Curated annotation (Swiss-Prot):
It holds the Pfam family FlgD. Belongs to the FlgD family. This is FlaA locus uncharacterized protein YlxG. Keywords: Bacterial flagellum biogenesis. GO terms for biological process: bacterial-type flagellum organization; bacterial-type flagellum-dependent swarming motility. Residues 1-21 are annotated as: Disordered. InterPro entries: FlgD (IPR005648).
Amino acid sequence: MTSISSEYKLPEKTNTVSTNNSSLGKDEFLKILMTQVQNQDPLNPIDDKEFISQMATFSSLEQMMNLNTTMTQFVENQDPFTTYVDWMGKEVSWTDGKSATDKTGTVSSVKHFKGNYYLVLDDGTEISPANVMSVGQSSK
Protein backbone atom coordinates (compact mmCIF):
# COMPACT_ATOMS: atom_id res chain seq x y z
CA MET A 1 0.00 0.00 0.00
CA THR A 2 1.62 3.28 -1.15
CA SER A 3 -1.12 5.80 -0.47
CA ILE A 4 -1.43 8.00 2.60
CA SER A 5 -4.60 7.90 4.57
CA SER A 6 -6.57 11.16 4.52
CA GLU A 7 -6.45 11.34 8.30
CA TYR A 8 -2.68 11.96 8.11
CA LYS A 9 -2.77 14.63 5.41
CA LEU A 10 -2.26 18.28 6.26
CA PRO A 11 -5.11 20.64 5.45
CA GLU A 12 -4.74 22.62 2.23
CA LYS A 13 -3.38 26.10 2.75
CA THR A 14 -5.55 28.87 1.40
CA ASN A 15 -3.96 32.06 0.17
CA THR A 16 -5.38 35.19 1.69
CA VAL A 17 -4.70 38.67 0.49
CA SER A 18 -4.72 41.44 3.02
CA THR A 19 -6.13 44.70 1.81
CA ASN A 20 -5.38 46.51 5.04
CA ASN A 21 -4.52 50.09 4.20
CA SER A 22 -2.43 51.44 7.06
CA SER A 23 -2.55 55.06 5.93
CA LEU A 24 -4.85 57.50 7.68
CA GLY A 25 -7.11 59.24 5.22
CA LYS A 26 -8.96 62.52 5.41
CA ASP A 27 -12.24 60.94 6.50
CA GLU A 28 -10.62 58.90 9.25
CA PHE A 29 -8.74 61.94 10.56
CA LEU A 30 -11.92 64.03 10.66
CA LYS A 31 -13.78 61.21 12.45
CA ILE A 32 -11.05 61.01 15.08
CA LEU A 33 -11.05 64.79 15.47
CA MET A 34 -14.85 64.94 15.81
CA THR A 35 -14.80 62.09 18.34
CA GLN A 36 -12.16 63.97 20.30
CA VAL A 37 -14.31 67.13 20.29
CA GLN A 38 -17.49 65.24 21.24
CA ASN A 39 -15.81 63.39 24.11
CA GLN A 40 -13.84 66.26 25.55
CA ASP A 41 -14.13 67.20 29.20
CA PRO A 42 -16.66 70.08 29.44
CA LEU A 43 -14.71 71.55 32.35
CA ASN A 44 -11.44 71.37 30.43
CA PRO A 45 -12.21 71.81 26.71
CA ILE A 46 -9.65 71.55 23.92
CA ASP A 47 -7.57 74.66 23.59
CA ASP A 48 -8.38 76.60 20.39
CA LYS A 49 -4.69 76.78 19.55
CA GLU A 50 -4.32 73.01 19.87
CA PHE A 51 -7.36 72.44 17.64
CA ILE A 52 -6.05 74.87 15.00
CA SER A 53 -2.62 73.24 15.21
CA GLN A 54 -4.12 69.80 14.55
CA MET A 55 -6.08 71.11 11.56
CA ALA A 56 -3.00 72.87 10.17
CA THR A 57 -0.94 69.70 10.57
CA PHE A 58 -3.55 67.67 8.74
CA SER A 59 -3.84 70.29 6.00
CA SER A 60 -0.07 70.25 5.54
CA LEU A 61 -0.03 66.46 5.39
CA GLU A 62 -2.84 66.44 2.84
CA GLN A 63 -1.00 68.96 0.65
CA MET A 64 2.17 66.85 0.78
CA MET A 65 0.20 63.77 -0.27
CA ASN A 66 -1.36 65.69 -3.16
CA LEU A 67 2.07 66.97 -4.19
CA ASN A 68 3.42 63.42 -4.13
CA THR A 69 0.58 62.26 -6.39
CA THR A 70 1.14 65.17 -8.76
CA MET A 71 4.90 64.56 -8.93
CA THR A 72 4.34 60.86 -9.60
CA GLN A 73 2.02 61.73 -12.50
CA PHE A 74 4.53 64.29 -13.78
CA VAL A 75 7.37 61.75 -13.77
CA GLU A 76 5.20 59.13 -15.47
CA ASN A 77 4.27 61.62 -18.19
CA GLN A 78 7.86 62.78 -18.66
CA ASP A 79 9.27 59.28 -19.09
CA PRO A 80 8.40 58.95 -22.82
CA PHE A 81 9.44 62.55 -23.44
CA THR A 82 12.90 62.06 -21.97
CA THR A 83 13.33 58.91 -24.06
CA TYR A 84 12.42 60.76 -27.24
CA VAL A 85 14.65 63.73 -26.37
CA ASP A 86 17.55 61.26 -26.16
CA TRP A 87 16.86 60.45 -29.83
CA MET A 88 17.59 64.03 -30.91
CA GLY A 89 20.57 64.12 -33.29
CA LYS A 90 20.27 60.38 -33.91
CA GLU A 91 19.26 58.66 -37.10
CA VAL A 92 15.98 56.77 -37.02
CA SER A 93 14.73 54.14 -39.39
CA TRP A 94 10.98 54.24 -39.76
CA THR A 95 8.09 53.12 -41.88
CA ASP A 96 5.03 55.07 -42.88
CA GLY A 97 2.94 51.98 -43.56
CA LYS A 98 2.34 53.09 -47.16
CA SER A 99 5.56 52.02 -48.87
CA ALA A 100 7.46 48.76 -48.57
CA THR A 101 10.80 50.48 -48.01
CA ASP A 102 12.06 51.86 -44.74
CA LYS A 103 12.93 55.53 -44.53
CA THR A 104 15.66 57.18 -42.50
CA GLY A 105 16.13 60.62 -41.08
CA THR A 106 17.80 62.49 -38.25
CA VAL A 107 15.64 63.63 -35.34
CA SER A 108 15.92 67.39 -34.85
CA SER A 109 13.19 67.94 -32.23
CA VAL A 110 10.36 66.34 -30.27
CA LYS A 111 6.82 67.66 -30.42
CA HIS A 112 3.98 66.97 -27.97
CA PHE A 113 0.51 67.75 -29.33
CA LYS A 114 -2.87 66.69 -27.91
CA GLY A 115 -1.38 63.90 -25.81
CA ASN A 116 0.73 62.44 -28.61
CA TYR A 117 4.46 62.66 -29.23
CA TYR A 118 5.98 63.29 -32.65
CA LEU A 119 9.57 63.22 -33.80
CA VAL A 120 10.45 66.07 -36.15
CA LEU A 121 13.17 65.12 -38.62
CA ASP A 122 15.73 67.43 -40.25
CA ASP A 123 13.60 67.68 -43.41
CA GLY A 124 10.52 68.73 -41.37
CA THR A 125 8.79 65.35 -41.55
CA GLU A 126 6.83 64.49 -38.40
CA ILE A 127 6.64 60.82 -37.48
CA SER A 128 5.09 58.90 -34.63
CA PRO A 129 7.58 57.12 -32.36
CA ALA A 130 5.44 53.99 -32.82
CA ASN A 131 6.60 53.87 -36.47
CA VAL A 132 10.30 53.91 -35.54
CA MET A 133 12.03 50.59 -36.13
CA SER A 134 15.57 51.50 -35.06
CA VAL A 135 17.58 54.34 -33.55
CA GLY A 136 21.30 54.76 -34.16
CA GLN A 137 24.12 57.24 -34.47
CA SER A 138 23.69 59.77 -37.25
CA SER A 139 25.82 59.16 -40.33
CA LYS A 140 26.25 62.91 -40.80
